[in-house]
Amino acid sequence: AHMADGYARASGRHGVCIAQNGPGVTNFVTAIAAAYWAHSPVVFITPETGSMTMGLGGFQETEQLPIFSKITKYQGHVNNPKRMAEITTRCFDRALLEMGPTQLNIPRDYFYGDIECEIPKPIRIGLGAGDEGALDEAAKLLAAAKFPVILSGGGVVMGEGTAAAAKLAELLHAPVAVSYLHNDAFP
């Protein structure tokens, strides 16, 4: 999970990882928390006990969704194999759209076999500076500021705006602080 987070931070693309149910999944906790605070688009796949034995105390069974509920942007649980493509696509879309980790929880028996399904088209958004009105308002605020300070973080990195942030800091003679886990947000 730490490697998936690192890959996502370095590439701006999805980092993906999968664990064994039970102890493998619980080993993801600190890495997924780090990805959450760094706004890394990580999709982590958590195999679950088989669909017919959930809640019966199977080998290494634990309730996996509550463990990650506060450190994910979205949690998808496949409750029917026919929804596999839909929920998988949703996890990948939400990881990028909301910039953070998503959990794809799949009962173990759904990993096998063939299904007929339509694969949804991924949602893509362009990262940009904002609309003209927002930019005008930001320029007015900066022009009126006596001691502007820049906080540069994950949004700057993912929007490939590090060089622009450096230029702005030079233009304004403004000090720059970086957000937690984003020392890469300013040169």
Residue ranges and their predicted role:
Residues 1-187:
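N-terminal alpha/beta PP-like core and its mobile active-site loop of ThDP/TPP-dependent enzymes
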